[in-house]
Amino acid sequence: MKPGFSPRGGGFGGRGGFGDRGGRGGGRGGRGGFGGGRGGFGGGGRGRGGGGGGFRGRGGGGGRGGGFQSGGNRGRGGGRGGKRGNQSGKNVMVEPHRHEGVFICRGKEDALVTKNLVPGESVYGEKRVSISEGDDKIEYRAWNPFRSKLAAAILGGVDQIHIKPGAKVLYLGAASGTTVSHVSDIVGPDGLVYAVEFSHRSGRDLINLAKKRTNIIPVIEDARHPHKYRMLIAMVDVIFADVAQPDQTRIVALNAHTFLRNGGHFVISIKANCIDSTASAEAVFASEVKKMQQENMKPQEQLTLEPYERDHAVVVGVYRPPPKVKN
């Protein structure tokens, strides 16, 4: 066997790149080593059909691989990873996705994109593509489902994300702002994103992001204590949560009771291992849904994030729905 070759997996070390969480083949490796954060240098969805962190998603034709990266390893059945994206927009069409504010870039590879609120700026080194519409040039940013749970849910076919132009969103667990930047693109200049992050190190990145994007309001505070930042945040339409804590449903509920309007919606990303690493993922998801129901949060759909994330699910629902009027 060749050194550094793992049987099932695109690239070095199964899922993700050169070490990124180890994957099924490589040594454990820091969470991001050479792999540029989940799904890095060639590790596509769970090693099957990698193609450079595959950007192809379940929506696009073709295998799960065939990425938007340059080159990319072959993985199993994943086509070659495609050349560098079309910077100039030759032979590229952008069409609206059914979720308002989200678009699909159709070219040699299909990719999920959002309209860049700050043209000319990349947030985390993502590809950008400019499309000429009449005299104007509109710039779109590629949205990588291996680095964003929300993009993974959209490509997985989630029915509603409730995040749309003009919406006010409370984002719990904002980290460095990778997904937050795309949410900021979607809600546009008329919307707002309150981004809550406890880590000061990630918070610095978030504050720098907010300097350029005026619709992001960074809150460097613990989401367990919403009363500490209630003076900063108005009522919101949607809560998006990616906090990966054992008591995350309680954290979301506390914030919902404080900031979410009645009839507002929530989108929660659940990582089974973070809640109970001994139970099966399905059992964990079911128990979290039960907890939500006890908090006046009514789940409407649940979706696993395969092939982008292992043992993750997204639950979308409505908070304190108005009572149905009986005729």
Swiss-Prot record:
<feature type="region of interest" description="Disordered">
    <location>
        <begin position="1"/>
        <end position="95"/>
    </location>
</feature>
<feature type="modified residue" description="N6-acetyllysine">
    <location>
        <position position="108"/>
    </location>
</feature>
<feature type="cross-link" description="Glycyl lysine isopeptide (Lys-Gly) (interchain with G-Cter in SUMO2)">
    <location>
        <position position="108"/>
    </location>
</feature>
<dbReference type="GO" id="GO:0016074">
    <property type="term" value="P:sno(s)RNA metabolic process"/>
</dbReference>
<feature type="cross-link" description="Glycyl lysine isopeptide (Lys-Gly) (interchain with G-Cter in SUMO2)">
    <location>
        <position position="90"/>
    </location>
</feature>
<keyword id="KW-0007">Acetylation</keyword>
<feature type="modified residue" description="Asymmetric dimethylarginine">
    <location>
        <position position="28"/>
    </location>
</feature>
<dbReference type="GO" id="GO:0031167">
    <property type="term" value="P:rRNA methylation"/>
</dbReference>
<dbReference type="GO" id="GO:1990259">
    <property type="term" value="F:histone H2AQ104 methyltransferase activity"/>
</dbReference>
<feature type="cross-link" description="Glycyl lysine isopeptide (Lys-Gly) (interchain with G-Cter in SUMO2)">
    <location>
        <position position="149"/>
    </location>
</feature>
<feature type="binding site">
    <location>
        <begin position="242"/>
        <end position="245"/>
    </location>
    <ligand>
        <name>S-adenosyl-L-methionine</name>
    </ligand>
</feature>
<dbReference type="GO" id="GO:0005634">
    <property type="term" value="C:nucleus"/>
</dbReference>
<keyword id="KW-0694">RNA-binding</keyword>
<keyword id="KW-0597">Phosphoprotein</keyword>
<feature type="modified residue" description="N6-acetyllysine">
    <location>
        <position position="211"/>
    </location>
</feature>
<dbReference type="GO" id="GO:0001652">
    <property type="term" value="C:granular component"/>
</dbReference>
<feature type="binding site">
    <location>
        <begin position="197"/>
        <end position="198"/>
    </location>
    <ligand>
        <name>S-adenosyl-L-methionine</name>
    </ligand>
</feature>
<dbReference type="GO" id="GO:0180021">
    <property type="term" value="F:U6 snRNA 2'-O-ribose methyltransferase activity"/>
</dbReference>
<feature type="modified residue" description="Phosphoserine">
    <location>
        <position position="132"/>
    </location>
</feature>
<feature type="modified residue" description="Asymmetric dimethylarginine">
    <location>
        <position position="8"/>
    </location>
</feature>
<dbReference type="GO" id="GO:0003723">
    <property type="term" value="F:RNA binding"/>
</dbReference>
<comment type="function">
    <text>S-adenosyl-L-methionine-dependent methyltransferase that has the ability to methylate both RNAs and proteins. Involved in pre-rRNA processing by catalyzing the site-specific 2'-hydroxyl methylation of ribose moieties in pre-ribosomal RNA. Site specificity is provided by a guide RNA that base pairs with the substrate. Methylation occurs at a characteristic distance from the sequence involved in base pairing with the guide RNA. Probably catalyzes 2'-O-methylation of U6 snRNAs in box C/D RNP complexes. U6 snRNA 2'-O-methylation is required for mRNA splicing fidelity.</text>
</comment>
<feature type="modified residue" description="N6-acetyllysine">
    <location>
        <position position="212"/>
    </location>
</feature>
<feature type="modified residue" description="Phosphoserine">
    <location>
        <position position="122"/>
    </location>
</feature>
<protein>
    <recommendedName>
        <fullName>rRNA 2'-O-methyltransferase fibrillarin</fullName>
        <ecNumber>2.1.1.-</ecNumber>
    </recommendedName>
</protein>
<dbReference type="InterPro" id="IPR029063">
    <property type="entry name" value="SAM-dependent_MTases_sf"/>
</dbReference>
<dbReference type="GO" id="GO:0032040">
    <property type="term" value="C:small-subunit processome"/>
</dbReference>
<dbReference type="GO" id="GO:0001094">
    <property type="term" value="F:TFIID-class transcription factor complex binding"/>
</dbReference>
<feature type="modified residue" description="N6-acetyllysine">
    <location>
        <position position="127"/>
    </location>
</feature>
<feature type="compositionally biased region" description="Gly residues">
    <location>
        <begin position="7"/>
        <end position="80"/>
    </location>
</feature>
<feature type="modified residue" description="Asymmetric dimethylarginine">
    <location>
        <position position="15"/>
    </location>
</feature>
<keyword id="KW-0687">Ribonucleoprotein</keyword>
<keyword id="KW-0488">Methylation</keyword>
<keyword id="KW-1017">Isopeptide bond</keyword>
<dbReference type="InterPro" id="IPR000692">
    <property type="entry name" value="Fibrillarin"/>
</dbReference>
<dbReference type="GO" id="GO:0042274">
    <property type="term" value="P:ribosomal small subunit biogenesis"/>
</dbReference>
<keyword id="KW-0489">Methyltransferase</keyword>
<keyword id="KW-0832">Ubl conjugation</keyword>
<feature type="modified residue" description="Asymmetric dimethylarginine">
    <location>
        <position position="21"/>
    </location>
</feature>
<dbReference type="GO" id="GO:0048254">
    <property type="term" value="P:snoRNA localization"/>
</dbReference>
<feature type="modified residue" description="Asymmetric dimethylarginine">
    <location>
        <position position="24"/>
    </location>
</feature>
<keyword id="KW-0539">Nucleus</keyword>
